[in-house]
């Protein structure tokens, strides 16, 4: 069976060789055609796309090659060739393969390379802050150059190129500032003057305010220029009657110019000059002058004029409101009459009827000041006032105006009497007050407020031992001896000679230790 099967297998082979003539050994082969099949390109390689995070494959180092050769010494050469063909020949080939694969399109908004919104926004803020700092430095340097009298230059810049103001004050709360704010207010009060009977037109009209400011600075040209530039720094209005009646803040009513002229057409103001000398000269130069059709009362805030009751008169039965046009229910409507003006009426009336002695400044009359007492919040008058003259003799002429009317400014009958002296409470002090302390008595509360007034009073009550150390000693002498005499106890020299105890002791000894009567 074996031989038969072998012969059967060899038979088809010979048949196939006979059927294909080019497989026979005797057939000639074309060398050009055979050369095409000698070399083979091998199987088709599928390009591998490496991951983005993975590093490209590099050539195997010599150490790795030695390890692989030692471990795979018995492997076939075909497997080694296959391993080397799988690895990329160079990193450039891997990069080309990555670039060849197209990336899927992104749906995100296209931005420029390296664009970061947060960083750009922060850079913009930093640039704006630098511009503001440069602007502040320029303004600060210009103000320092204008105000500096000695011509001192601005402090040199630091290494970083930023100028540092060492003298800049750190802002503090007013409660922590304490005495520093008090000193500033006191220095400011020396440059401030009080203005009374100012027309309310200065609040509502810019031209009227400009006229008032021009009048207040009219005397500044007479002051010496060596003492500094004299001008008005600021002016503020106080004690103004507003139409709101206290329902809205005073600042809001002032901004809206809701002035209630029916109560009173006058107000008070405070003008701050640039120098203390200008503030001292202002009362003598401006008091009693007429501006905006009203007599102006000017007084120094730091050193007000003395109130002398011997030169004052008390005026009663005055109008509470200047324009009393309103009527109650059931009353007949009064005839239309011009509105009264209490404060200006007192100035004009008493100046016109006191011509006996012209003791005041030329052309200003004899009235020094008029003080109408009003409510603090509503500015409604309380029906009385005080008029002070320059000369005491004017009081006698003013008393003749009792029970008289002077319409339209003073439509009611006046009650004119001598002013009485008001006894003031004495300030409790440990010793005689100094001149500097007397200047603040009675004015500390008005200038600095209640808290600062209490602080000053507490400081005045302190003894010397609480405020400072006291060193006591002796005054030096030429011979170096001390002038202080110390009394020492002397037993024999200053003892009494014929004393009663001495006589009793002598009698006791003479009696032999027994009691005996002492001879007289």
Swiss-Prot record:
One of its GO terms (biological process) is maturation of LSU-rRNA from tricistronic rRNA transcript (SSU-rRNA, 5.8S rRNA, LSU-rRNA). Residues 1-29, 41-185, 472-520 are annotated as: Disordered. This is Nucleolar protein 12. Residues 120-132 have a biased composition (Basic and acidic residues). GO terms for molecular function: RNA binding. It is found in: Nucleus, Nucleolus. The keyword rRNA processing applies. Keywords: Nucleus, Repeat, Ribosome biogenesis, RNA-binding, rRNA processing. It comes from Emericella nidulans (strain FGSC A4 / ATCC 38163 / CBS 112.46 / NRRL 194 / M139) (Aspergillus nidulans). Belongs to the RRM RBM34 family. Its main location: nucleus. Involved in pre-25S rRNA processing. Gene3D superfamilies: 3.30.70.330. Residues 78-95, 144-168 have a biased composition (Acidic residues). Coiled coil: none annotated. Residues 484-520 have a biased composition (Basic residues). Residues 191-303, 311-421 form the RRM domain. It comes from the Eukaryota.
């Amino acid at each position: 069976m074996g031989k038969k099967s072998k012969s059967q297998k060899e038979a088809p082979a010979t048949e196939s060789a006979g059927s294909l003539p080019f497989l026979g050994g005797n057939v000639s082969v074309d060398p050009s055609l055979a050369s095409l099949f000698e070399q083979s390109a091998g199987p088709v390689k599928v390009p591998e796309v490496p991951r983005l995070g993975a590093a490209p494959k590099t050539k195997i180092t010599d150490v790795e090659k030695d390890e692989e050769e030692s471990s795979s010494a018995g492997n076939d050469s075909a497997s080694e060739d296959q391993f080397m063909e799988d690895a990329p020949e160079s990193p450039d080939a891997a990069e080309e393969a990555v670039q060849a694969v197209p990336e899927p399109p992104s749906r995100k908004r296209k931005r420029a390379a390296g664009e970061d919104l947060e960083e750009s926004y922060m850079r913009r803020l930093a640039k704006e802050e630098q511009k503001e700092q440069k602007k502040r430095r320029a303004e600060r340097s210009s103000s320092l150059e204008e105000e500096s009298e000695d011509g001192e230059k601005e402090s040199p810049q630091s290494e970083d190129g930023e100028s540092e103001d060492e003298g800049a004050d750190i802002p503090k709360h007013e409660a922590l500032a304490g005495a520093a704010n008090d000193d500033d207010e006191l220095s400011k009060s020396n440059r401030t003057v009080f203005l009374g009977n100012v027309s309310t037109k200065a609040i509502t009209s810019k031209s009227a305010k400009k006229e008032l400011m021009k009048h207040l600075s009219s005397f500044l040209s007479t002051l010496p220029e060596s003492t500094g530039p004299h001008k008005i720094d600021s002016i503020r209005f106080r004690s103004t009657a507003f139409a709101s009646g206290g329902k809205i803040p005073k600042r809001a009513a002032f901004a809206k110019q809701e002035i209630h002229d029916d109560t009173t057409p006058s107000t008070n103001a405070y003008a701050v000059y640039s120098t203390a000398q200008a503030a001292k000269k202002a009362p003598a130069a401006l008091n009693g002058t007429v501006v905006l059709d009203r007599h102006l009362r000017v007084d120094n805030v730091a050193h007000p004029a003395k109130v002398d009751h011997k030169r004052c008169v008390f005026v009663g039965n005055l109008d509470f409101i200047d324009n009393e046009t309103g009527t109650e229910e059931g009353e007949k409507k009064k005839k239309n009459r011009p509105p009264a003006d209490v404060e200006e009426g007192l100035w004009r009336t008493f100046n016109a009827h006191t011509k006996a002695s012209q003791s005041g400044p030329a052309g200003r009359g004899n009235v020094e000041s008029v003080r109408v007492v009003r409510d603090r919040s509503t500015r409604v008058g309380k029906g009385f006032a005080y008029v002070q003259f320059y000369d005491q003799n004017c009081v006698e002429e003013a008393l003749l105006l009792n029970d008289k009317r002077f319409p339209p400014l003073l439509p009611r009958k006046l009650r004119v009497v001598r002013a009485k002296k008001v006894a003031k409470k004495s300030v409790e002090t440990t010793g005689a007050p100094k001149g500097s302390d007397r200047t603040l008595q009675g004015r500390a509360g008005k200038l600095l407020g209640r808290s600062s007034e209490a602080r000053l009073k507490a400081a005045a009550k302190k003894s010397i031992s609480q405020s400072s150390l006291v060193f006591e000693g002796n005054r030096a002498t030429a011979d170096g001896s001390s002038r202080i005499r110390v009394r020492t106890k002397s037993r024999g020299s200053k003892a009494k000679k014929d004393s009663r105890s001495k006589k009793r002791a002598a009698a006791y000894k003479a009696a032999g230790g027994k009691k005996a009567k002492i001879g007289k």
